[in-house]
Every structure is written in structure tokens, then in C-alpha cells.
Amino acid sequence: MTTTNRTSHPIALRDATVTDPFWALRQELVRTQVIPYQWNALNDNVPGAAPSYCMHNFKAAAAQNAEHHKEGKAFVPPKYTFRGFEALPDDPAHPDSDKFYGFVFQDTDFSKWIEAVGYSLTHHPDADLEATADTAIDIVCAAQLDNGYLDTYYILNGMDRHFTNLKDHHELYCFGHLTEGAIAYYQATGKRKLLDAACRFADYIDSRFGTADGKLHGYPGHEIAEMALVKLAETTGEQRYADLAEHFVRQRGQQPLYFELEDRRRAREDGRNYAPREQNYAYYQADKPITEQTEALGHAVRAAYFYAGAADVARLTGDSDLLASCERLWRNIVDRKLYITGGIGATHMGEAFSFDYDLPNDTAYSESCAAIALAFFARRMLEIQPKSEYADVMESALYNTTLAGMALDGKSFFYVNPLEVVPEACHRDERKAHVKPVRQKWFGCACCPPNIARIVEDVQQYAYTIGDDSSTLYVHLYMGGGVHARLSGTDVRLDVMSDMPWSGKGSVAVGFDAGDSASDASKDAVFTIALRLPAWAGGETASDAVTVRGRDDISRVIRDGYLYLTGAWHDGDVVDFDFPMPVHMVAANPLVREDAGKVAFVRGPLAYCAEGVDNGANLHLLHADTARIASDPSCVSVDRIVFHAGAVAQDEQGLGEVDAVDMPMTTLTIPAWREVEDSAQTSALYHDWRPAERKTTTATLIPYFAWANRGENEMTVFLRG
């Protein structure tokens, strides 16, 4: 494979550990609570949670496959019957054992779960968990058809119509997640059963898709296969998988539009009139080739997955036009469509991007999966071009929206991540019905919970990459742990200490692995440690916060927001960093109408918010004292506390329940004032204007990821100034 554009590549997961209290705690939570909980959810064993039907479907498909093998030519396969985008049983307590239930993409619940399992087993071998996973894999593989096809929706509903609705029915999306899960499990355990199944499915897809006559000229409706195929190519060494990924990226949006041809054919076969005005192929990023796209449009998760896959292909092929397209779409997202919490996708209509600068707070969609997809895109752009802005955005998406998607006890989840919540509006205003004031135990469309689990268990792969020159280690995120890398022919160990995200203080200790010739104190090794200079610390002006103990001979070069420290490193050398972490009072671009006259507070990678439990009801009457804060930033108090989470259930199904959790955290206390609710004013709907009477107070702000862990109450990120 050519790697013209490639500058660095991810470090192997087993070569990086996380030990700091922040991320290690979350990985342990996923390992001990979330993974077992989600396995129960996949098997419909969580009381009060929406059924998944995921493993039910695999078992049904496996049973049908066994029947086929037993009966041979006498077997009569099901003939396709459309049962809707989501099929539910008449009696949820007694689903038919041979029917498919759930959404068309329900298989991916397993795939993301097994991916998280693989990541967890990499650093925490667990015989019981591995046995459970092996049993699940046996069931899944038993559902695979002899030709390699593996999607239970069509296996159970009728293979005569498979690959006829790529736009909506997610077969290639299911393949992509299956493949990523299979790779993670193989890399953790060395077991190939699921990986071989993924390869057989990939081989079948490769035999059916392409530009040659007789092949399907289509591409995924919901993207992720592109990333998965590149990863599969790099895992197996099979170039044709990377070629198929490139085909999907380049073919998308070419004339004639494949989805339009597909829609017309299906309408004709179903005896319907084709209605072109009802179609919006931009929603699928398929109205034009990516090299002609200038704006991030459509379903936010699909879009960011597509851009990440395109970046992978640009990296492999060295295609400068494709890379320029990725850069152009990145700029549109971060300059005009990105929430301060690292979320994307402003509207619930299609879970999609809205128009430029349309970033409502109380109706924000900001899906958890979309923030994760943005992190995927950012990491791949970092591999091509180590620019700190990619890591800045990636960090924000991970620390804010991604973590907000999961309760602090790991037992409930947000699909949607608003920046302002009034519970009554959520309950009574249908326009805000998608916004939930408390997390849910599970979802019928449960893409987000296992997505959060897999990225948390894999987060260290976002922290580091290794330069393709084999002599540079990039540090993109600051989390405590250990990193092993071969640099300039020497096996190097870096031990990272970090107090993130509460302070910018930490260190990187250099060591040489035992048995390497450089482990002798008289030896050294020449390589580069490239440290990101975070935007929240001042960017490149923060380079003075980095020192190398007793080593004036280490060269220092700043480029694209990274400080490159190069020299002959000795065993025991230590790099210290103490990045400033001021509180930033942030205003949105004036074109963001919803934030006019408002401010938000950011410290380090964290966005902060106000909750009613700390600040009282009617948060719209609470103002930040912007004049005082601007004139004296020291008036904002930064406090290290123990945050007490916990909430009782709101109903017999356990909605809103959060187990008692005590967690170290930082809060902000800012000068503020409240509008006094004058009875003469509030008794009338309208009245003559007069200046609001002010009551001086303070406002307590908590990290955004921690909101809704103390029961149902108001929340806002932006405060009136």
C-alpha cells in the first residue's frame, strides 16, 4: 500500500496503558459495569429497558441456517417481506423465535459490544468474559450463509431482496461494525473465528461491488464500511479490501446517482410511482462526489464516518484532491457547525447538520455517536497532518459530549446531548420530545451506548501516534499511563503522569525497555517527542510550559501547534509540563443567533454548565457578571471537590436512577446576578419595559459531562451576560 500522505500511525492498543484516575476510572467502569450490562441488554435481560432483540435475531438466523444445511435443496428460504424500518413483535414478552425484530441495523449492537470486549481483554484478561464472548461469536458465526453474507435482517426476511436498498437498509453498515469488532477481538485474543467470518463477508461484498459490468455500482447508505475495510486491509495485508474502500469513497455521488436508480427500480418493482422531490441524496452525502462537496450536510454520524473513511483513503493513496476535500469539510464543521461541547448535528430532523451557524441549545441533537464520529475523523486527519487543531477538537468531543452520553455509574445513557434543558419543555413540547432530561437505560435504536463503551476502552489509541519516520512519538492527549514504542531502532518506554482534565500539570519520563542495548545508562537514543500545545493553554505560546530536566541540548521546534523535542535521550530523562489552564469566558460567533448576548465557560478541555440543583430554577433569569469577570478573571473560583452523584428512580422501570457515586471533580464558582421576579411584572404577560432589578449572587458550574447525575432538573451551558 502506498502511504504518500501518511505522517504517523496509531500505536498498538497493547502498547499503551491508562493509569490516571480520570480515564482509568472510566475504563474500569466500562469493564466491570457497562460491558456486562450491555450483554444483558443485547439478550433483553434488563428490566425496564427497551428490548434489543440483537442476540434473538442471530439465534433465529443460526437456527434457520442449520435447518437449511439439514434439508439441503428441500429447504424453502423465506421470500422477502418488508416489515418496516423497525419490526416489533405483537407481544413483546413472546417474540416469535424465527422472526427478525428491531431496527434493520440491530446486528451492530453485538458488533460494537464485541469491539469493546476486545479492547478490554487487551489489558484485562478475563476468562469468564472471554468465554461469554466466544459463545456469542459461535452464535453469530452460525448465522453466516455459505456465501459469506451475514446480516440477519435479510437472512430472516428474505435474501431475494438483499443489496436492493443500500440507501436505507444498512447491510454494509452492519458489515463495517462486524469487521471492526472482529479485528479488536482478534488482536486481543488471537482468535480468528469472527475475523474469518468478517473476511468471508468482505470477500462476498468484493465479489458483488465494483465498476465492472455485472457488478453493483453502489456504496453504503450509512457509512462505516470504508473505515472498516481499510482497517481490515491493514490487519490482513489484503490490498483488495483497501481498493474496495477506495471504490466506495470515489463512487459515492457519481452520476447517475446509484441511490436514485435504486429508488426508481424499487418503486417500479413495488408498483409505486417514483417521487423525485421526496428524495434528498445530500442527506446521505451522495448527491455529488466528495471532491465537489463544500458543506457538511445530512445525517451527522454518516457524514463524519464518511469523511473519516475518505481521510483513510487519502492517507493510503496520497490523493491530494481527496485530502483537500477532507480539509474543506473539516473547516465547515469546526468553523460553522460545531457545538462548544464538541458535538455535531444540530437538528433532530434526520439527526442532521443544519445550516451554517444554526446551533440551537434546547433542541440540539448532538448525538453521542456523532461526537465519536468526529473524533474518528480528527484522529485520521492527525495521522496525515499532525496539526494541533485536530487534537483540540478530538479532545473536546471525547471529554464533553462523548462522556456526557453515559451516567457516572455506567448504567444509563444519552442519545441526544442538549446544551439547555427545561424538563417541563421536554415532557410537554413535542418539538423537544427528542431531548431527555435524564438518561435512559437502553434504546431500541441503541447505537450510542456500545459506541461510547468501545471508544472509552480504546481511548489511549487517540492519545498517541508514531511517526512513519520511526523516530517520532506524538502525544496528542495528556493522560497518565505507559507507552511502548520502537523509536530509531530502540525500544522506548514513556511513563506519562497527568492531572488532566483538572490541571495542565504532568510529566513524561523516558526509559529503555530491559534487554535493549540502550538500557545501559551510558547509552542513549536519538528520537523526537512531539507534544501538542493545547489551544486552551494558549497554543504555541504555551511552549515555555514544557521543560526537559537538566537537558539544554534537546532541540525545540514548534510546528503546527506541536513542540518537537529532539535529541539523544538518556534513560531517566524527564519532560515536565505545566500548561496554564485559565477559565475562558467564551462568546459564540455573532451569527449564532441562539447564543447572542450569552457566554459559556471552558477550562482546559472541559465545557461547564449550570444545573438547577446548584443554582435554583429558572436558569434563564441567571446572568453571568461578565463585566466583573472580564476585568478580574481571578474572581472566578476553581474548586477541587468530591462530586456526589446519585438519583432515585422516577418510575418502576428505574428511569433516571443513578447509583451513588463519589468522584473527584473541579467546579467553577462565578460572580452572577439574578433578575428579581417582580410580582407586578410576572402577573402580566406583557408590561412596559424597565431595567431588571438585580440580585447579586454566584453561579456554580460543573463539567458538562457530569450533568443529569443528580436527578431531573434544569441545565444550561450558555448563560445570559
Q: Predicted regions span which residues?
A:
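A conserved hydrophobic secondary-structure block that centers on an alpha-helix together
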Residues: 157-235
